[in-house]
Amino acid sequence: MKKLLIIGITVIMFFFNNQATADYEKVFFDFKIDSIGGEKIDFQDYKNKVVLLVNTASYCGFTKQYDDLQKLWDQYKKDGLIVLGIPSNSFNQEKNNNNEVKEFCEVNFSINFPMSVITDVKGDDAHEIFKWAKKNYGKSAVPKWNFYKILINKEGKIEDTFSSLTNPTSNKIVSKIEKLLQI
């Protein structure tokens, strides 16, 4: 019985291990992505910053979270927070092209935080940043739906992930951001 208990605890610890302390071969800052405006976003530019990476979509029930993502950006960008939106059609709820997404975000939500081009976030065609996240943090870093959030610390490692149900301005997210920003 004791042996079974030890095996059970070991299995549980394996599945709930905090991968944020994993020995990363690469960190977040080693990647790049195309911006929705046509430039290249080099994550090296975000070194020593805290990044909230969010896969977004225009036709989702969570699309209203754009407002709160913009509020986070406005409130904490001076302290070193980067909100990075990654529009995705991985869940079949995004517009047809980047110009439509850009216009939608600017007109409806006055978005001015960095946004990438429409990007796959899961499966074999996922952008390398999402493959990196899965490799280093496990399945909990794979977006389950639109507006899934991955919090990256100043060292370029995954600190935490948050479901689509977790509002960007929730105490759960804001307290982690403030802790990482040391404010």
Regions found by a protein language model. Give the residues of each.
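Positively charged n-region of N-terminal signal peptides that target proteins for export
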Residues: 1-4
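Thiol-/selenol-based redox modules, centered on thioredoxin-like
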Residues: 131, 135-183
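Bacterial N-terminal signal peptides
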Residues: 7-15
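N-terminal "domain-start" segment that seeds a small globular fold
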Residues: 20-44
